[in-house]
């Protein structure tokens, strides 16, 4: 499988003054090859002025960003866009911190020009239900699968939320993981954001006691056979598999891909072909560069690096990837000051 980069653009004007920091983008394709991209932004991650912002890509140009979800004094996080039958869904988290965030959803029937009032995704449930970072999977049986996770002060755990009625109700299915005590953490090659207080939690003793997996990226290899690849605290990506449309999962297990405890995303192209965007770096909270694209032709058993999107020191993180025909659309965080968009063409 061959990949070629055809477009690389900043979503925001260079040197903009819309906000101090931006992070965690999501991308969705509308009919006619048009795109919508959302992210959270404000003074810094976790600050009360963070909001969800949206930009449109049409005829090769990005629109000025607009703020589409905000509430003064309440941190907003990790938007996920989903397009279904003429309706644009926006899922996102709100809360004082990640341990206590909850999920809200808004809908647009005019491609993001206007939005419904926010509502809880699962009324009465204070857990962070629904998608946590990566896109929904619409399975072959028509059900929606939302890759999800929860983080407390010690343990990180992934799960999926399943909807048989197109997002009206959700059923939670856990992904098993045996937790262990975190190992020793060398301070070399750490992500610079830890030193610069870019993370919502600045107590590094607490940060390094977290153990587990979060932020799954999901695909269906054949009807009912569903898989997730997950970020971990353990220096490698973890995987879990299901044979019953995501209702039951095997114990999560490490695969032969490094992970720096930062988000990844992948897309399934059929016939066992997968394209993954990730930081090929091993270590807990290690540096967030380079940013690379890897390919698999055997449903994730083996991987080969195909492209490097960013090589210089910096933070290039939290990628999102979707497929639209033979084009792959990728967005990612650029030093928390911008969002980069890349178009890749695949063949073979």
Predicted features and spans:
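Asp-box/BNR beta-propeller blade signature and adjacent active/binding-site loops
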Residues: 1-348
């Amino acid at each position: 499988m061959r990949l070629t980069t055809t477009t690389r653009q900043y979503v925001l004007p260079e040197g903009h003054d819309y906000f101090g920091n931006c992070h965690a983008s999501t991308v969705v394709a509308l009919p006619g090859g048009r795109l919508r991209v959302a992210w959270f932004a404000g003074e810094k991650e976790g600050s009360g002025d963070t909001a969800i912002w949206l930009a449109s890509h049409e005829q090769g140009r990005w629109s000025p960003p607009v703020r589409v979800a905000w509430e003064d004094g309440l941190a907003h996080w990790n938007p996920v866009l989903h397009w279904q039958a003429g309706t644009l869904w926006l899922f996102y988290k709100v809360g004082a911190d990640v341990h206590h965030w909850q999920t809200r959803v808004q809908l647009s029937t005019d491609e993001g020009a206007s939005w419904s009032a926010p509502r809880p995704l699962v009324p009465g449930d204070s857990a962070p239900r629904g998608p946590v970072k990566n896109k929904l999977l619409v399975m072959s049986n028509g059900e929606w699968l939302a890759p999800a996770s929860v983080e407390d002060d010690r343990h990180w755990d992934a799960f999926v939320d399943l909807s048989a009625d197109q997002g009206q109700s959700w059923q939670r299915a856990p992904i098993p993981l045996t937790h262990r005590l975190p190992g020793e953490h060398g301070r070399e090659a750490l992500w610079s954001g830890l030193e610069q207080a870019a993370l919502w939690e600045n107590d590094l003793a607490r940060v390094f006691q977290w153990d587990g997996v979060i932020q799954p990226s999901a695909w269906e290899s054949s009807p009912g056979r569903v898989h997730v690849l997950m970020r971990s605290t353990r220096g490698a990506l973890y995987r879990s598999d299901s044979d019953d449309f995501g209702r039951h999962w095997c114990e999560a297990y490490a695969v032969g891909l490094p992970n720096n405890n930062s988000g990844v995303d992948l897309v399934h192209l059929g016939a066992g072909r997968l394209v993954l965007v990730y930081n090929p770096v091993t270590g807990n909270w290690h540096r967030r560069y380079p940013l690379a694209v890897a390919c698999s032709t055997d449903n994730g058993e083996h991987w080969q690096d195909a492209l490097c999107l960013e090589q210089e020191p910096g933070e290039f993180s939290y990628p999102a990837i979707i497929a639209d025909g033979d084009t792959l659309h990728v967005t990612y965080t650029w030093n928390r000051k911008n969002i980069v968009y890349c178009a890749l063409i695949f063949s073979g």
